[in-house]
Amino acid sequence: MIEYRIEEAVAKYREFYEFKPVRESAGIEDVKSAIEHTNLKPFATPDDIKKLCLEARENRFHGVCVNPCYVKLAREELEGTDVKVVTVVGFPLGANETRTKAHEAIFAVESGADEIDMVINVGMLKAKEWEYVYEDIRSVVESVKGKVVKVIIETCYLDTEEKIAACVISKLAGAHFVKTSTGFGTGGATAEDVHLMKWIVGDEMGVKASGGIRTFEDAVKMIMYGADRIGTSSGVKIVQGGEERYGG
């Protein structure tokens, strides 16, 4: 069934796909509400995370994205706000055992995470081990029912058909978003990848653009081509760029 759905999606892509914006524009509030203010650096300190959370509160970002060891701290810093705590699972390689990813996700939610960004098993995807990839994602989704799960497909390592397959499997497995990149690979988000991903998953799922998004113009372009969320460590700079352009 999985293979059939992938083949069907590839055939539709070859016949009907057209690269064009999905919306005409995006304003500063659209950008703010899409940003997941991110610090996944291996040398991030508790003070860095406190600053990240303060900036997210002040700018009314959607959320912060932090490494698992900082979920509790971020939860405390954001208490009483609408800012979501997002963390990562199987990060950054995606090569953990499936049960390890599931347990990581459970521990993260117990610590206060609202959303989980898990890394797909890239090697298994490239080997066309579709059932493995499906179960890998499904196990995380099932382990944290009621929480948002995003699947990082690491587009820089995939060809077009593999990107389509990753999106199809993520959707079948019950994930809520697909995400372009870890930020630790050889490339980040592109408008072309974001648009393709949105075209495949449709309105039933979201798309998170992440990796290399550093300016207001970058963020607007991603949203115009289908991104629902923006993962970036440059959230404040992006907002400042929008305010300089439009006033604020």
UniProtKB/Swiss-Prot annotation:
Family listed: Belongs to the DeoC/FbaB aldolase family. DeoC type 1 subfamily.
Role noted for this protein: Catalyzes a reversible aldol reaction between acetaldehyde and D-glyceraldehyde 3-phosphate to generate 2-deoxy-D-ribose 5-phosphate.
Localization of this protein: Cytoplasm
GO cellular component: cytoplasm
Enzyme Commission number(s): 4.1.2.4
GO biological process: 2-deoxyribose 1-phosphate catabolic process; carbohydrate catabolic process; deoxyribonucleotide catabolic process
Major enzyme class: lyase
Native source species: Thermotoga maritima (strain ATCC 43589 / DSM 3109 / JCM 10099 / NBRC 100826 / MSB8)
Catalytic residues in the record: D117, K179, K208
Protein known as: Deoxyribose-phosphate aldolase
Record field: pH dependence: Optimum pH is 6.5 for 2-deoxy-D-ribose 5-phosphate cleavage.
Keyword Cytoplasm: yes
